[in-house]
């Protein structure tokens, strides 16, 4: 099939003017299909003639039938028929409604004849858009490889019929919509036309009186909110970007969890996680959704085998289902989770021709397993769903109640907000609903990840954003001059990032103030720099490998690796500041400043808008060894490796390497901080040896081998997404914490509770964690252990919260309320573990954490808190050979009767400190 660009050239060959009939008032066309493209567009951006493809065939759509009867348009009509023909000898049939077209074609030497109906002997069929009896035949004719030339207007038809839903009832739309082209009831202006040399843009937004409010109301009938609070899942956020797609459940930040869309003759509903198919509170909505998808046909509802729980929920509401492994030919609705082998073409045609699709899936786990690969481009669910105007993103949403759109209120939608952004940017005035511009920026950046090459529906958005952002200089966000996120300037930062990552020309994105770390000031090396990178990864997850190189901002770099490395699933990452700030009210830096991409070719060009340290992301179990990496456009950055870098070499690097960020590394920890702070370190060796001692203690308590298979990372940033520090890979902290990380004397005298707290968070395992109670508690065991065993700082001095009088008061307050897990959190929860440690030492913890870590997946540890807590009681009791059930009961733990009975054979723990508390506790 020819590309839209090539097709446009063929259709416009020799066309020098649009001489349309003066007394004909056409309608505006709406284009949503990935194969659809505009041909004739007026000066206000309305599409009047378009083309598309469906199945093996093609269609050309005119917004008034008179366009197909106008002899002055003979050049275009001849081109259209020629493009629609599958071969030069294909027969052309013309419906009697377009009889004059036969003579126009004949005058140009093209034979055609009147045919009352489309049939298989024809290669092209020409008809107006008002025929109600032939719609199914016309769709199948095109699908099998036929060419369709169709014209009509819907605004007049709308005034005459009983059904005012033009998009879904107008006869022409029952045909052309399968290819993503719709006749609307908007009148089109015919005062001025320009013959385009290149394909014109598709408008961002076509406003139709025929909106989707009836569909939304039907789906949400009787629904107050969509509550998934206790669903035990984190759904993916949905990007709703199609003109006929609409959100159904939104959080306070306008993040969408469930959405629906019309596509062709069919309908789609998407949830951000398959678990939502099993949530009892969503039962009424699930019933509404399946009935809406069925469209009143009372047809066969097919549920994918893996989702059989949904069948039970639907049965309660009187809907019978058929459980099948795949879509069946007689299905009316198909409920499923898309996997790697999803039949994209089959399912898209199923919907286009009237089927209903109910999809549940999340993409954040796929994104975690595939760093540097956009889920919008490669996630199996999105290969199917992008075309429907709904995409699954890697951003997760917190489980909770999601509000539903209310009648008469405006709801955030990417396209409508982008259209308003366009108006504001053009006029420098306007008003958008609160929070919409803060959402537009990241949504736009996400949308730009959808592959757009030769897909006009997406290319038009790229072109618009390039045009808008090239008119104005990019804001520069700093701590001294922050940028408000929910405004045009904030949106520009995210949109510029998306454009840069999509390959747009960086010369269009000029900042208000030139960054001192941009290529203009840092001046990358004229010759390429080659470094050797260790690409062996014995760990169980991907890891970053430092290169010691920094990429200046607003730069395109060329990266080269050997052929063997290009096929090893390596990724390139520019930048280490991974926190997503899109929900921050003020921005001290761009909201998303790293760029990841696949290193899938021996030589690759990569765009860098913000600059940053360069890393290779190495997949788990990689055994590549040392890989030579050659980079053109980089500068060197200070990098110190314990045991490898000499003191003299370190001094030289600080003097000669201009990179503004540097790293201090051991085999177990890597600290990333500004170079300005590193200049205070004449000799990092004592500091890093201390860090290695602390990391050894962290590993020992957690039952982990040492040296670590992969080093932990701590990165300082001008702004992070949450808290003073947070765990993860990497651990993130504020710039104010840098001295705490790199000042050995300070560490030895005052300790460093915060960083070790986050290292402890990274040690937590779901098998022995009881969220939310212990989330901020058990990690502090590592703080106490490291401070006491490595730094020699007792717990009472390491943190004021562990001063003995404070601890005792906390326990008594807890007991005075009646011991209950409901109140057992944070420092109170930690006290339980500290009492055990003070009685039995650290060894039981070390042995127990090791035992948990070494458990095989076949042992199937419990997943709910009550069972996990009882397992902990049993295992700790066995470790210390004491019956600890009474101790934990005193703390209000939900000890199961059978567990208490099973531990009765063990000796009583006579020194149980909780006995003393209970004996001396004032009655409450």
Swiss-Prot record:
PROSITE patterns: PEPTIDASE_M60. One of its GO terms (biological process) is negative regulation of cell migration. GO terms for cellular component: plasma membrane. The keyword Metal-binding does not apply. Its main location: membrane. SUPFAM superfamilies: Class I glutamine amidotransferase-like (SSF52317). Pfam families: M60-like_N, Peptidase_M60. GO terms for molecular function: transmembrane transporter binding. InterPro entries: Class_I_gatase-like, M60-like_N, Pep_M60_3, Peptidase_M60_dom, TCAF. It is found in: Cell membrane. Interacts with TRPM8 (via N-terminus and C-terminus domains); the interaction inhibits TRPM8 channel activity. Interacts with TRPV6. Belongs to the TCAF family. The C-terminal region is necessary for the channel activity stimulation. This is TRPM8 channel-associated factor 1. The gene is Tcaf1.
């Amino acid at each position: 099939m020819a590309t839209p660009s090539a097709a446009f050239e063929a259709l416009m060959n020799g066309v020098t003017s649009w001489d349309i009939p003066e007394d004909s008032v056409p309608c505006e066309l709406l284009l949503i299909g990935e194969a659809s493209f505009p041909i004739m567009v007026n000066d206000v951006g309305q599409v009047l003639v378009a083309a598309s493809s469906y199945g093996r065939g093609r269609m050309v759509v005119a917004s008034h039938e008179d366009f197909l009867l106008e002899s002055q348009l003979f050049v275009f009509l001849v081109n259209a028929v020629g493009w629609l023909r599958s071969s030069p000898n294909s027969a052309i049939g013309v419906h009697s409604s377009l009889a004059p077209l036969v003579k126009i074609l004949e005058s140009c030497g093209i034979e055609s004849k009147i045919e009352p109906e489309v049939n298989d002997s024809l290669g092209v069929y020409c008809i107006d858009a008002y025929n109600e009896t032939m719609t199914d035949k016309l769709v199948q004719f095109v699908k099998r490889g036929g060419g369709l030339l169709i014209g009509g207007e819907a605004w007049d038809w709308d005034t005459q019929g009983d059904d005012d839903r033009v998009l879904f009832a107008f006869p022409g739309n029952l045909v052309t919509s399968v290819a993503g082209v719709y006749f609307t009831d908007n009148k089109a202006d015919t005062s001025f036309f320009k013959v385009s040399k290149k394909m014109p843009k598709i408008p961002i937004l076509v406003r139709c009186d025929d909106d989707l409010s009836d569909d939304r109301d039907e789906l949400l009938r009787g629904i107050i909110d969509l509550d998934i609070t206790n669903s035990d899942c984190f759904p993916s956020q949905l990007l709703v970007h199609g003109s006929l797609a609409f959100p159904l459940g939104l959080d306070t930040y306008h993040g969408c969890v469930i959405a629906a869309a019309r596509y062709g003759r069919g309908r789609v509903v998407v949830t951000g996680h398959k678990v939502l198919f099993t949530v009892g509170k969503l039962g009424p909505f699930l019933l509404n959704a399946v009935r809406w998808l069925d469209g009143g046909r009372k047809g066969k509802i097919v549920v994918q085998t893996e989702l059989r729980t949904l069948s039970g929920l639907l049965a309660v509401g009187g809907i019978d289902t058929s459980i099948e492994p795949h879509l069946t030919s007689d299905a009316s609705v198909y409920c499923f989770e898309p996997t790697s082998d999803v039949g994209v073409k089959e399912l898209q045609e199923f919907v286009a021709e009237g089927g209903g699709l109910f999809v549940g899936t999340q993409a954040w786990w796929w994104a975690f397993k595939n760093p540097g690969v956009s889920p919008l481009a490669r996630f199996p669910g999105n290969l199917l769903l992008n075309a429907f105007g709904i995409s699954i993103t890697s951003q997760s949403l917190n489980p909770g109640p999601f509000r539903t759109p209310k009648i008469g209120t405006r709801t955030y939608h990417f396209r409508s907000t982008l259209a308003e952004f366009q108006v504001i940017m053009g006029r420098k005035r306007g008003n958008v609903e609160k929070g919409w511009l803060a959402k537009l920026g990241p949504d736009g950046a996400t949308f730009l990840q959808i592959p757009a090459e030769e897909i006009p529906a997406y290319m038009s958005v790229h072109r618009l954003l390039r045009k808008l952002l090239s008119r104005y200089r990019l804001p520069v966000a700093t701590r001294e001059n922050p940028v408000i996120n929910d405004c045009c300037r904030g949106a520009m930062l995210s949109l510029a990032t998306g454009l840069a990552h999509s390959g747009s020309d960086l010369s269009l994105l000029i900042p208000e103030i030139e960054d001192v770390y941009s290529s203009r000031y840092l001046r990358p090396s004229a010759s390429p720099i080659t470094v050797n990178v260790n690409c062996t990864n014995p760990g169980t997850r991907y890891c970053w490998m430092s290169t010691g190189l920094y990429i200046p901002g607003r730069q395109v770099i060329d990266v080269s690796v050997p052929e063997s490395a290009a096929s090893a699933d390596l990724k390139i990452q520019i930048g280490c500041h991974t926190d997503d700030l899109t929900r921050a009210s003020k921005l001290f830096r761009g909201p998303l400043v790293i760029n990841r991409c696949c290193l899938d070719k021996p030589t690759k060009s990569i765009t860098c808008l913000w600059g940053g340290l360069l890393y290779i992301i190495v997949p788990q179990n990689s055994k590549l060894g040392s890989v030579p990496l050659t980079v053109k456009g980089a500068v060197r950055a200070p990098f110190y490796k314990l045991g490898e870098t000499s003191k003299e070499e370190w001094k030289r690097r600080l003097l000669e390497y201009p990179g503004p960020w540097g790293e201090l590394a051991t085999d177990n920890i890597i600290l990333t901080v500004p170079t300005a702070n590193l200049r205070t370190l004449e000799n990092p060796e004592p500091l890093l040896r201390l860090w290695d001692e602390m990391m050894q203690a962290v590993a020992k308590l957690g039952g982990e081998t040492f040296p670590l298979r992969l080093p932990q990372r701590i990165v300082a940033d001008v702004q992070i997404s949450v808290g003073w520090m947070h765990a993860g890979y990497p651990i993130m902290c504020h710039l104010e914490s840098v001295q705490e990380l790199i000042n050995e004397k300070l560490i030895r005298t005052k300790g460093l509770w915060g960083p070790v707290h986050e290292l402890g968070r990274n040690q937590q395992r779901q098998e022995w964690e009881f969220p939310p109670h212990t989330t901020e508690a058990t990690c502090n065991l590592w703080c106490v252990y490291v401070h006491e065993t490595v730094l020699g700082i007792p717990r009472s001095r390491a943190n004021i919260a562990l001063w003995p009088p404070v601890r005792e008061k906390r326990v008594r307050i807890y007991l005075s309320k009646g011991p209950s897990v409901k109140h057992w959190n944070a420092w109170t929860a930690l006290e339980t573990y500290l009492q055990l440690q003070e009685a039995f030492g650290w060894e039981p913890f070390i042995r127990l954490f090791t035992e948990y870590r070494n458990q095989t997946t076949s042992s199937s540890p419990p997943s709910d808190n009550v069972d996990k807590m009882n397992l902990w009681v049993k295992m700790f009791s066995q470790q210390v050979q004491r019956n600890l059930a009474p101790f934990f009961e005193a703390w209000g733990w939900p000890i199961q009767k059978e567990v208490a009975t099973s531990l009765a054979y063990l000796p009583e723990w006579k020194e149980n400190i909780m006995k003393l508390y209970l004996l001396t506790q004032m009655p409450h």
